[in-house]
């Protein structure tokens, strides 16, 4: 239904969802555009420490890409090695990772940016603890600078909080080390920004 809703809309949209594949359950993001499911990206790093115990439910992403059946005879790509490109804008190459993937020692986005991704999208349910908002902001800025990319971070909102964890919709957009937009924690704002992908391509050629 969500894919059908995007028909006629020239916008790349990512949604989070659980996906069952070959007997295992994965925490995934689906890329939607123009009524199509362009790909499904599973989460690579599954946290199982502190307040996180995702391994009770989810398996880490398998290596490589595979075909995933959708409906009728239609299929899509399932895997982490995907870049979503705009044929009219050569600089636009979008990769996706999920929450803990960014906080890991070697995030999947390191591989994605090395393969040409200029924008990395992160669908996150990052809970709030003392000092975490500032650390999160610092982490995103450093990661986007180190990998010369734009990093778009969408966080779970207050309505998704439970008795165990609190979420604050701390959305962020960073570009090559600079913070472009921020939706403050526990607010009602949105993070929106215009990205200079041509400048990032120029920076990459210089490095």
Question: Residue locations for each model-derived region?
Answer:
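Enzyme catalytic cores with a strong preference for nitrogen-chemistry domains
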Residues: 1-207
């Amino acid at each position: 239904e969500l894919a059908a809703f995007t028909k006629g809309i020239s916008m790349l949209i990512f949604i989070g969802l659980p996906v069952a594949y070959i007997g295992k359950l994965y925490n995934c993001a689906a890329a939607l555009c123009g009524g199509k499911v362009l790909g499904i990206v599973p989460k690579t790093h599954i946290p199982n420490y502190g307040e996180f115990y995702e391994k009770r439910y989810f398996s880490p992403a398998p290596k490589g890409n595979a075909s995933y059946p959708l409906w009728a005879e239609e299929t899509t790509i399932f895997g982490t090695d995907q870049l979503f490109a705009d044929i009219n804008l050569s600089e636009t190459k979008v990769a996706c990772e999920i929450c803990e993937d960014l906080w890991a020692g070697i995030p999947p986005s390191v591989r994605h940016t090395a393969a040409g991704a200029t924008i990395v999208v992160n669908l996150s349910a990052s809970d709030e603890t003392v000092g975490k908002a500032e650390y999160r902001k610092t982490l995103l800025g450093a990661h986007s600078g180190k990998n010369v990319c734009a990093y778009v971070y969408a966080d779970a909102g207050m309505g998704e909080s439970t008795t165990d964890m609190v979420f604050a919709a701390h959305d962020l957009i960073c570009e090559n080390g600079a913070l472009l937009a921020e939706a403050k924690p526990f607010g009602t704002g949105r993070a929106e920004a215009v990205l200079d992908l041509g400048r990032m391509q120029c920076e990459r050629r210089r490095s």
